[in-house]
Amino acid sequence: VALINNQFLPYPYYAKPGAVRSPAQILQWQVLPNTVSARSCQAQPTTMARHPHPHLSFMAIPPKKNQDKTDIPSINTIATAESTITPTTEVIVNTVATQEASSEVIESAPEAKTDQVTSTVV
Protein backbone atom coordinates (compact mmCIF):
# COMPACT_ATOMS: atom_id res chain seq x y z
CA VAL A 1 0.00 0.00 0.00
CA ALA A 2 1.52 3.29 -1.09
CA LEU A 3 0.71 6.68 0.40
CA ILE A 4 -0.06 9.37 -2.16
CA ASN A 5 0.75 12.89 -0.95
CA ASN A 6 -0.51 15.59 -3.23
CA GLN A 7 -0.88 19.30 -2.51
CA PHE A 8 -4.30 19.31 -4.20
CA LEU A 9 -5.81 16.55 -2.06
CA PRO A 10 -7.43 17.60 1.23
CA TYR A 11 -6.16 14.45 2.98
CA PRO A 12 -3.81 11.67 1.89
CA TYR A 13 -5.04 8.78 -0.21
CA TYR A 14 -3.77 5.25 0.03
CA ALA A 15 -3.23 3.41 -3.23
CA LYS A 16 -4.10 -0.26 -3.37
CA PRO A 17 -2.78 -2.20 -6.34
CA GLY A 18 -5.56 -3.48 -8.54
CA ALA A 19 -5.66 -6.21 -11.12
CA VAL A 20 -2.56 -5.78 -13.25
CA ARG A 21 -2.79 -6.78 -16.88
CA SER A 22 0.03 -8.21 -18.88
CA PRO A 23 1.63 -5.87 -21.46
CA ALA A 24 0.00 -7.87 -24.27
CA GLN A 25 -3.46 -7.06 -22.89
CA ILE A 26 -2.87 -3.31 -22.54
CA LEU A 27 -4.18 -1.52 -25.58
CA GLN A 28 -1.66 0.66 -27.37
CA TRP A 29 -2.20 3.62 -29.65
CA GLN A 30 -4.58 2.74 -32.42
CA VAL A 31 -4.95 4.30 -35.84
CA LEU A 32 -8.41 5.66 -36.57
CA PRO A 33 -9.61 6.20 -40.13
CA ASN A 34 -10.31 9.68 -41.41
CA THR A 35 -13.99 10.35 -40.71
CA VAL A 36 -14.17 13.97 -41.92
CA SER A 37 -17.05 14.66 -44.31
CA ALA A 38 -16.44 15.18 -48.04
CA ARG A 39 -17.24 18.91 -47.72
CA SER A 40 -13.85 19.53 -46.11
CA CYS A 41 -11.53 21.68 -48.23
CA GLN A 42 -8.31 20.00 -47.11
CA ALA A 43 -7.49 16.34 -46.82
CA GLN A 44 -7.09 15.46 -43.16
CA PRO A 45 -4.20 13.20 -42.11
CA THR A 46 -4.90 9.98 -40.29
CA THR A 47 -5.31 10.72 -36.59
CA MET A 48 -3.83 8.89 -33.65
CA ALA A 49 -6.16 8.39 -30.72
CA ARG A 50 -5.76 6.72 -27.40
CA HIS A 51 -8.20 4.12 -26.19
CA PRO A 52 -11.11 6.02 -24.57
CA HIS A 53 -10.97 4.00 -21.33
CA PRO A 54 -7.37 3.53 -20.19
CA HIS A 55 -6.94 0.86 -17.55
CA LEU A 56 -5.68 2.06 -14.21
CA SER A 57 -3.29 -0.20 -12.38
CA PHE A 58 -4.36 1.10 -8.96
CA MET A 59 -7.36 2.62 -7.24
CA ALA A 60 -7.17 5.63 -4.91
CA ILE A 61 -9.14 4.88 -1.75
CA PRO A 62 -9.71 7.58 0.88
CA PRO A 63 -8.81 6.61 4.45
CA LYS A 64 -11.57 5.86 6.92
CA LYS A 65 -12.64 9.01 8.73
CA ASN A 66 -13.12 7.34 12.10
CA GLN A 67 -9.82 5.46 12.39
CA ASP A 68 -8.71 7.14 15.62
CA LYS A 69 -12.15 7.61 17.15
CA THR A 70 -13.77 5.21 19.57
CA ASP A 71 -17.24 3.95 18.85
CA ILE A 72 -19.85 6.31 20.27
CA PRO A 73 -23.27 4.76 20.78
CA SER A 74 -25.97 6.59 18.92
CA ILE A 75 -28.52 8.23 21.18
CA ASN A 76 -31.95 9.22 19.97
CA THR A 77 -32.25 12.86 20.99
CA ILE A 78 -35.73 13.32 19.55
CA ALA A 79 -38.33 12.92 22.29
CA THR A 80 -41.48 11.05 21.42
CA ALA A 81 -44.53 13.27 21.34
CA GLU A 82 -47.14 12.31 23.90
CA SER A 83 -50.70 13.44 23.44
CA THR A 84 -51.86 15.78 26.18
CA ILE A 85 -55.55 16.09 26.98
CA THR A 86 -56.52 19.74 26.93
CA PRO A 87 -59.96 20.57 28.32
CA THR A 88 -61.88 23.09 26.26
CA THR A 89 -64.89 25.03 27.43
CA GLU A 90 -67.71 25.58 24.99
CA VAL A 91 -70.72 27.75 25.70
CA ILE A 92 -73.99 26.41 24.32
CA VAL A 93 -76.95 28.75 24.29
CA ASN A 94 -80.40 27.21 23.96
CA THR A 95 -83.16 29.63 23.08
CA VAL A 96 -86.52 28.11 23.94
CA ALA A 97 -89.87 29.81 23.59
CA THR A 98 -92.20 28.46 26.23
CA GLN A 99 -95.86 28.60 25.47
CA GLU A 100 -98.51 28.33 28.09
CA ALA A 101 -101.53 26.09 27.70
CA SER A 102 -103.82 29.06 27.83
CA SER A 103 -105.29 30.97 24.95
CA GLU A 104 -103.54 34.19 25.92
CA VAL A 105 -100.94 35.65 23.59
CA ILE A 106 -97.59 35.83 25.31
CA GLU A 107 -95.59 38.79 24.17
CA SER A 108 -92.61 38.33 26.44
CA ALA A 109 -89.19 37.59 25.04
CA PRO A 110 -88.19 33.93 24.84
CA GLU A 111 -86.17 32.58 27.72
CA ALA A 112 -82.46 32.12 27.19
CA LYS A 113 -80.89 29.12 28.89
CA THR A 114 -77.07 28.92 29.07
CA ASP A 115 -75.33 25.60 29.71
CA GLN A 116 -71.59 25.27 30.15
CA VAL A 117 -70.16 22.09 28.66
CA THR A 118 -66.60 20.90 29.17
CA SER A 119 -65.23 18.47 26.59
CA THR A 120 -61.84 16.87 26.23
CA VAL A 121 -60.22 17.06 22.81
CA VAL A 122 -57.23 14.85 22.05
Swiss-Prot record:
Pfam families: Casein_kappa
Keyword Acyltransferase: no
Entry's family note: Belongs to the kappa-casein family.
Chain spans, region Disordered: 102-122
Glycosylation sites: 84, 86, 89, 95, 102, 118
Compartments, record wording: Secreted
Lineage: Eukaryota, Metazoa, Chordata, Craniata, Vertebrata
Residues where Phosphoserine is found: 102, 119
Site (Cleavage): 58-59
Positions bearing Phosphothreonine: 98
Predominant subcellular localization, coarse grouping: secreted
Keywords: Glycoprotein, Milk protein, Phosphoprotein, Secreted
GO process terms (BP): lactation; protein stabilization
Name of the protein in question: Kappa-casein
Tissues expressed in: Mammary gland specific. Secreted in milk.
Gene Ontology cellular component annotations, sorted alphabetically: extracellular space
InterPro entries in alphabetical order: Casein_kappa
Gene source species: Rucervus duvaucelii
Keyword Heme applies: no
Cited function: Kappa-casein stabilizes micelle formation, preventing casein precipitation in milk.
